[in-house]
Amino acid sequence: KPWLKNRISRCFFGPIKRPPFNRDELLDGVDYYPGDYLGKLAREGINGLWITVEFRDLAETSFAKRDPMAQRRLEKLRKTVEKCGRYGIKVWLFAIEPASLPAGDPLLAAHPEWKGARGWKNDYAFCTSSESALRYLRESLADIFAQVPNLGGLINISHGERITNCLSALPAVSDAQVNCPRCSKRPKWEIHADAARA
């Protein structure tokens, strides 16, 4: 028995869902988890694998309908969870959420309170300083976990690699003011705590 409760790894064969390729493993027909590989992981004490997802690619909420490709993604995710489970391996969702929203996104038009600090490109941080924003995040996760039973859990980087909430528009050790009309009035820790609690 491993001394760690969860020994989680990224699949050696799985594609990376970021530039330059941005490949979504849940949309292609490739089996990234062959039985021999899963058996070897299980013998080595690995009991978790993570798959990169974006909430809006999978979830339906009271704010947004399900993406047209979501059912295909969810079906492959369910099959992967079931297959890995036969080897005692849980599938964990890896996310960088809440995801920033590009300028012109219909969600920003419908919910201007979600438009947070200006991002690095032509995007905006997802402002978590409103109850509707937090409800959107909670509904997204609840829907995904309801659609795919037996997931291991969620690994989320909410400050680091990309713009997420308004605090993430600043470097982690910055003393600068958060550039958002709502979040600039709040303690920085509170901004991050909201996203984590959702």
Predicted feature residues:
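Feature activates predominantly on carbohydrate-active enzymes
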Residues: 1-159, 164-183
